Amino acid sequence: MLMNSVIALTFLTASSNNGGLNIDVQQEEEKRINNDLNQYDTTLFNKDSKAVNDAIAKQKKERQQQIKNDMFQNQASHSTRLNETKKVLFSKSNLEKTSESDKSPYIQNKQEKKIFPYILMSVGAFLTLGFVIFSIHKGRRTKNESARKSNI
């Protein structure tokens, strides 16, 4: 009842343009091309304004380069010690001098091998395989019995 009333209200309140069942096919076939073309008649789209576009692109590139320089070159002062940090992180001589950490590394050879999960997985696989074999065997048996009954 509720669904019927919702559908009825939908049909009553739907306008022909917004969700109505009456579709105006001729309105769909009309093509609206080049409406408001004059709004695009600016200096950015003219052939004569190549110099303006090139200047804008040059300003963008200069600004991006300035941002990169500020971030990576000019601000790497003595207080940030960027070069020292790079040497510590990436030099081969500092590999022996590792910093101490409270986290223990994951070394696979020294890890205790737990066999209990593998036992559980093998028992589960064995039971699953047994169930599949049992159901196939039972299905064949019932199929053979029904064939025998139909022959009698």
UniProtKB/Swiss-Prot annotation:
Signal sequence region: none
Protein location: Cell membrane
Intervals, Extracellular compartment: 136-152
Keywords: Cell membrane, Membrane, Transmembrane, Transmembrane helix, Virulence
Any one GO cellular component localisation term in the record: plasma membrane
Topological type in the membrane: Single-pass type I membrane protein
Chain segments annotated as transmembrane: 115-135
Keyword Transmembrane helix attached: yes
Stated family: Belongs to the EssA family.
Protein name: ESAT-6 secretion machinery protein EssA
Gene: essA
